[in-house]
Each structure stands twice: as C-alpha cells, then as structure tokens.
C-alpha cells in the first residue's frame, strides 16, 4: 500500500 513500502509502496 501507500505506507506498506515492502508490499507495494505505490498503492499496488
């Protein structure tokens, strides 16, 4: 997600 960084970072 937007705050995930490790998972998406870009909202993906």
Curated annotation (Swiss-Prot):
Tissue expression remark: Expressed by the skin dorsal glands.
Modification type Leucine amide: residues: 12
Chief subcellular location: secreted
Top-level taxon of origin: Eukaryota
Compartmental location: Secreted
GO annotation terms (biological process): defense response
Alphabetical UniProt keywords: Amidation, Amphibian defense peptide, Secreted
One GO CC term, this protein: extracellular region
Name of the protein this chain belongs to: Caeridin-1.4
